């Protein structure tokens, strides 16, 4: 009996260990999907143009997962080798800290059980992250810092205009060097404590999204239950963020939060991953009128790559959303915001971004317009508004 019990315990621990090793990759593979496709045809003109671009992306959730981004994988959307194959230069790495059970674009309760808690446990994150959203953001930030320290030839962390200038100088002789920035996916990452704004800033965060898929202490989500604007806590948080020159992202904010933030911000707003209602009537997207107000105040609108935002799953659909955005708000206000590794299905991964350049040429955009959208608008914004 004693021998049987020992064998049972051994098998139990083996099963648990196997689960903890295998499960994160299975979840990642199932969440971050690339539609099966034949290799995209890239013309000589598109290939030459793409290789000359500075490509920047405002939104990827790659730090959420257990992948070592220095290695190339056959699942998920991003890692350094694939980014380099796609000629990626600037990437905003966003940190997901809470995802409500049953998450959808229409209505989510802030009291719903949280998917990220189980993911954090399964991926063996520090125990402090199991109960603190701030610790989850800080842990993911530390992952990016560790990558920059371990692989300085391929990644440089950017926190200021001076560091951005240094990065651009280094990239002239090291064209595969990636410039990484940090942002939050919702300011519930503050854990309801304004002091955490400084903690996150000190750890390198330079963009903060106000909401995600549910209402939080700052105000209503576009996909929440209240539809409310900024609360007093939200106004206080925005004031402190602006004082630290943190860039504000309203991607998932209620329309009233966007209106309130526009009224009080002295810095143009970002919509880091989105589509346009006039192009794709989805509850994921705010109204075209608000998009025009954001752009009129100097803001940037970054177009995503997934069906829920652009009503299609092809490079041509991404290009169509971009063309619509240019017609709506102007070529100086459109950028890329893939939402790579954000539990979405896309038509390409980070190695295939030349397919977007090809699609934009096919849509008759000029090379100047393509340069702006693919990264120069992002660069200009960062050069202007980073601390």
Regions found by a protein language model. Name each.
Residues 210-212, 217-288, 302-307:
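Active-site core of metal-dependent hydrolases
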